[in-house]
């Protein structure tokens, strides 16, 4: 079979690019032909593409950008031969990167996928200025989905806000076989959309005979490591605020490294535009010495206590770091996610468990009305072996929890990390996900209707869909499909 993973371009891909990479490899290893395609607001040329690839290959691109640049950390996906990074996603040639405002854009797309069996969609146009070209209405983007029924189209859902941010997917239900949800929160929120859905957890490629790379706790020289995109939900500032308490009063400071980039990182480190929320204050930190109240940034104080910033690392370098790391930290929390789950296991934590690092996560209980009033059963939370820190922990409580974690016995560390590796092998396996997608696509609508849950478009979904499709793009609903 021929499988294409496609999207309408966005910024800030984050861990989704690793999802794509490992699914491509899984399909390829199962004997299928794979490719990547993207619809973009702007076109490119073969000359520009070749020049940039030459810079990637020679290392010139990495040498000429800033240490923390979002354009850093590019590496080559050997499965498809394209370069990618964790911020901008895949860098594609003109054959696979279609400028939607080109006169023949839809025809080029349909020619590219004419022999495809399955298309996995990551993103579609929502209410964004990126698709608002002056003088040109983008009221035809639905035509990229207007393909023959023999081509099975599946939408990949990565977001627990999907029923609000991308609810206009409901306008495409006649063309989508099902939605594949990458985590429990995404699956639960899609109950508000009238398209069948499956829970296929955020996958990683794992060889069938793979074993966890054993490296004893005492031989791992990196104490704590966190690599994330700096955005509001990640709450990297809370980890950074905890570092002075982690290293205060200890005989030998713990080694703490963080990596990643994003607009919030710029606000944390700017000498003149540091956001107030990224300053040390007694309001944030009741244990802060009064003389520091409003006088120093969280970032600068953490650096004084030993934090090291690694810039924008490639996926391979992150994995290498995790193999030498004792504790991998995800400081993120979200009141919206708390309606559906107790914690969120993202791609970084999955990578950590594959490399034998011990995860540190947040407990979402109490963040939302639903998490207080309802007993939310989260099977992943119940089964993962992790250090759990409450979402509302003070910087001192956070830091002392990390201190305590570091006293874990090597025996418990090994036992728990082996357990987590097997959990990933069983539940986050890209080959299993690929096989399930193929099985459902081969069975078609009859199998999907029989086996998968299907939600109902909520009033809110219908309202948002109408606003995006009709008011913003000028697309009359329901869509009259031509194919």
Model-derived regions, located:
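Nucleotide-activated donor-dependent transferases that construct or modify glycoconjugates
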Residues: 1-13, 38-40, 123-125, 223-226, ...
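A short, active-site helix/loop in glycosyltransferases that binds the activated sugar's phosphate group
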Residues: 160-198, 235
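Short beta-strand->alpha-helix junction loop in the catalytic core
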Residues: 159-161, 184-186, 195-212, 229-231, ...
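Conserved catalytic-core segment of nucleotide-activated headgroup transferases in glycan assembly
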Residues: 206-209, 216-315
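A short, glycine/small-residue-rich beta-strand->loop->alpha-helix junction that serves as a flexible
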Residues: 7-21, 44, 127, 232-234, ...
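A charged, aromatic-enriched C-terminal amphipathic alpha-helix characteristic of glycosyltransferases
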Residues: 15, 393, 407-470, 474
